[in-house]
Amino acid sequence: MSSKTTATKENALSKQEIDGRLSKTALARLASYRADGMIHLTPIWFDWNGKVFRLTLGAGRIHLKNLARDPRVSILIDQDPRLEKGIGAGAWAIMCRGTATLSQDAKLIREVTHAVLVKALGSAEADQYTEPVMAEGRTIVTITPQDWLTWDYNKAD
């Protein structure tokens, strides 16, 4: 385990490692630009299909207004078990900058909303909550990755 620097060639994640972690992890942090140039940053559930991030946002979310004006976005997915298990437990992170597109396609909204809920809550709860969540009015945000920065402290040294 290394603490010399956050991201190095030696501790970077491979494409397969990125896909594996993104397929299992449900919580990310999404950053978009507000009109005044400041960052708007919130936790969010997501789906990863091996090529793009897919998010389902409720009507009125600030991110939707921000992304309609400026599609630049950053997303962070990480785990740091050192906080509970000590320094030897390591930590990993996946940071991605990309471009967001917004969709109001009803079929896509249902598909992505259900996929995000299954990943976060499991099938039974997803089946129970998909319709109530859909009733809120949703927009699908698809993030196409452009730049990645990854690390896994368990790979370092």
Predicted segments with their positions:
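Charged, gly/pro-rich active-site loop segments
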Residues: S2-L13, I87-D157
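Short, basic/aromatic recognition patches
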Residues: S3-R29
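Amphipathic alpha-helical interface surfaces
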Residues: I18, H63, I109-T113
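A generic structural signal for nonpolar/aromatic side chains embedded in well-ordered alpha-helices
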Residues: L22, N66-L67, V116, I143
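Structured helix-beta-strand junction loops
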Residues: K24-T25, R69-D70, E136
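Short beta-strand segments
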Residues: T25-A59, K65, I75-I77
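Solvent-exposed residues in well-ordered beta-strands and their adjoining turns
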Residues: N49, G58, D78, T101-S103, ...
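Helix-adjacent hinge/juxtasegments
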Residues: T56-W92
